[in-house]
């Protein structure tokens, strides 16, 4: 298993290119199942989750070609050979459930494995299923699979009232609604930029959609969708992560392709902490000149609030802030697993349920730490950039799911970082 070694060595300076959003791309790829015409995605990220979605689509008979070193994906679902998404692939990635709505809408039937780790009665996937049932789908859950059939004549437009905001369920309902008969209204829809990006792509394919980016989306179903070429939106989580690198270490870094509207709530917190963010026309320039950052309080919320996927990285910054910060996690449970690892580096953090209190210290010290998930892994790397001495991060395979060339990008702005093969004991 690989490890990443980070040595704190002062301010960073330079440029970091930001790639297309993984979470957007994972929703855009299944949109190929809505049409028999080619769909081309540009600015695609090169990540393990993208390869998993590629394998899933190919198992259904879709063609997926990776061009220009993986930055362009050419997809075609002209002749599907299967409508069954097997557990062996679906268990690797929850986004696999996004093939359900498109297959059901276009061909009237689908069999999709439930994602791994779903506890009965509290499954996030229930919101996806409720939306499709509202559109007339007949769903039968047996042996770990959803067996779905559309009514004769296809899915029907419906009013869908989500009791909770769900990005994935909004995406599934949105794609299914494009080919449903009549009008579909999605209430309490997710407002994330990835939803807006999906709607823009579907509109390029011929869909009639209004209201994306608000909590109510209206879709007028059409008979068929065509092909399109669509650029994947910038990854706002990767953007925020790399913006934190100079915030933690000092220096000045320009994140190419960055946009304020994607990270507005995050930028407000950086401003409170004393970090300067400037739009340049090519991206966002982030700088921290002198002294410690100020403590700030953070509450994670659905977009346009502070994103839960930047909470761990923000905690790394606040570990050395002047004063005490409180982070409240309102999206996911058990999202503070990085806190004990940061404590190994000298951070003073108290966790009580969904709250973490961070008492800023002057300096972190390098230590061996273990990544527990994708965002935790990068938060430990960021902390290591500003720590005294050497930090060794184990279990970094999580990184490959969400960050492309993280070592190369950080090294390009002056970080002392390398990835090595872990040496086994004995």
Curated annotation (Swiss-Prot):
Q: Which GO terms describe its molecular function?
A: UDP-N-acetylglucosamine 1-carboxyvinyltransferase activity
Q: Name one GO biological process term.
A: UDP-N-acetylgalactosamine biosynthetic process
UniProt-listed InterPro entries: Enolpyruvate_Tfrase_dom, Enolpyruvate_Tfrase_sf, MurA_subfamily, RNA3'P_cycl/enolpyr_Trfase_a/b, UDP_GlcNAc_COvinyl_MurA
One cellular-component annotation, GO: cytoplasm
Question: What EC number is given for this enzyme?
Answer: 2.5.1.7
Top EC class for this record: transferase
Secretion signal: which residues? none
Provide the reaction this enzyme catalyses. Answer: phosphoenolpyruvate + UDP-N-acetyl-alpha-D-glucosamine = UDP-N-acetyl-3-O-(1-carboxyvinyl)-alpha-D-glucosamine + phosphate
The biological pathway it contributes to is: Cell wall biogenesis; peptidoglycan biosynthesis
User: Would you identify the family this protein belongs to, as annotated?
Assistant: Belongs to the EPSP synthase family. MurA subfamily.
NCBIfam families in the record, alphabetically?
murA, PRK09369.1
Summarize the protein's role: Cell wall formation. Adds enolpyruvyl to UDP-N-acetylglucosamine.
Q: What name does this protein carry?
A: UDP-N-acetylglucosamine 1-carboxyvinyltransferase
Q: Give the originating organism.
A: Paracoccus denitrificans (strain Pd 1222)
Taxonomy of origin reads: Bacteria, Pseudomonadati, Pseudomonadota, Alphaproteobacteria, Rhodobacterales
Q: Which gene encodes it?
A: murA
């Amino acid at each position: 298993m690989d490890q990443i070694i980070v040595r704190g060595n002062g301010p960073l300076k330079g440029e970091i290119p930001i790639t297309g959003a993984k979470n957007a791309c994972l929703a855009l790829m299944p949109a190929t199942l809505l049409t028999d015409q080619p769909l081309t995605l540009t600015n695609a990220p090169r990540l393990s989750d993208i390869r998993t979605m590629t394998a899933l689509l190919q198992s259904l008979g879709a063609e997926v070609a990776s061009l220009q070193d993986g930055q362009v994906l050419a997809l075609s679902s002209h002749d599907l050979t299967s409508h069954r998404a097997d557990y062996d692939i679906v268990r690797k990635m929850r986004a696999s459930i996004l093939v359900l709505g498109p297959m059901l809408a276009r061909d009237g039937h689908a069999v999709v494995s439930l994602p791994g780790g779903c506890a009965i009665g509290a499954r996030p996937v229930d919101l996806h299923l409720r939306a499709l049932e509202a559109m007339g789908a007949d769903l039968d859950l047996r042996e770990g699979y959803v067996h779905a059939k559309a009514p004769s004549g296809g899915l029907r437009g419906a009013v869908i009232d989500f009791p909770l905001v769900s990005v994935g369920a909004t995406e599934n309902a949105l794609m299914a609604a494009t080919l449903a008969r009549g009008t579909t209204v999605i209430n309490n829809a997710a407002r994330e930029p990835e939803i807006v990006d999906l709607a823009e792509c579907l509109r390029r394919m011929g869909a009639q959609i209004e209201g994306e980016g608000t909590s109510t989306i209206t879709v007028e179903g059409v008979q068929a969708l065509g092909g399109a070429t669509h650029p994947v939106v910038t990854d706002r989580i990767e953007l925020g992560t790399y913006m934190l690198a100079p915030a933690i270490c000092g220096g000045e870094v320009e994140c190419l392709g960055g946009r304020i509207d994607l990270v507005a709530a995050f930028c407000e917190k950086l401003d409170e902490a004393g970090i300067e963010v400037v739009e340049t026309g090519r991206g966002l320039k982030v700088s921290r000149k002198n002294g410690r950052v100020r403590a700030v309080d953070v509450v994670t919320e659905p977009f346009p609030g502070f994103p839960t996927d930047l909470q761990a990285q923000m905690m790394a910054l606040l570990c050395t802030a002047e004063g005490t910060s409180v982070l409240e996690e309102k999206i996911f449970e058990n999202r503070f697993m990085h806190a004990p690892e940061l404590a190994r580096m000298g951070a003073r953090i108290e966790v009580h349920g969904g709250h973490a209190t961070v008492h800023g210290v002057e300096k972190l010290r390098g230590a061996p730490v273990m990544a527990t998930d994708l965002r935790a892994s990068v938060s430990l790397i960021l902390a290591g950039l500003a720590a005294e001495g050497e930090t060794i991060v184990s279990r970094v395979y999580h990184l490959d799911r969400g960050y492309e060339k993280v070592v190369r990008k950080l090294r390009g702005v002056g970080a002392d970082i390398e990835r090595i093969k872990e040496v086994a004991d004995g």
